[in-house]
């Protein structure tokens, strides 16, 4: 059974209709493109400044915060990407909430609400840490980052559990594929986050050459696996359309 809602609206009342795959690709391509632009631009044109460390040891990669938030035009490009993709991410969170209400067991629907809450808070925290940078607003940026990471890790775990064992129906092949990617991306994300934390502490304690480079590399993996996890919505809602009409609001439909 495809994850779709049995709602049929008057075609004349439909405000828009588009394939969910297109929505998912746009929602991912904005931050993904912005991230790669910021890193590549920093390495090409701001290498010395973006890779500088407080103890001036050898470093070859900018941290995520340095790449996206410290210099222009990277700061503006990243903020624009996050600003434009936020409504799409919130729309996807709303679609997931409706999906969980429709397709998971009634006794577990609080988990669906929790997943939606974590997803929304993660999105808002990402917005905050992008617009309040570490260079200009360190405490706000730090707190937003902590909230982002906590909600991100919890959301990935809850989302995986929701899709693994509390569905009402047997999973279809594309849903099983999504589940495998969720599991693998979550595990890589957690491992990379742990290694990034280790490298950060070691760098601050010993100031060894190259350690901050590994910290930045593991940061990149955390960012990319987070984006990849959210991209699994492509398979969760395979071959469906996102429809918005005046009566039902935003929902999924096969028609």
From Swiss-Prot:
It is a multi-pass membrane protein. The chain crosses the membrane at residues 23-43, 111-131, 143-163, 185-205, 209-229. One of its GO terms (cellular component) is endoplasmic reticulum membrane. One of its GO terms (biological process) is GPI anchor biosynthetic process. It comes from the Eukaryota. It is found in: Golgi apparatus membrane; Endoplasmic reticulum membrane. InterPro entries: Frag1/DRAM/Sfk1, PGAP2. Pfam families: Frag1. Keywords: Endoplasmic reticulum, Golgi apparatus, GPI-anchor biosynthesis, Membrane, Transmembrane, Transmembrane helix. Involved in the lipid remodeling steps of GPI-anchor maturation. Required for stable expression of GPI-anchored proteins at the cell surface. This is Post-GPI attachment to proteins factor 2. It comes from Drosophila melanogaster. The gene is PGAP2.
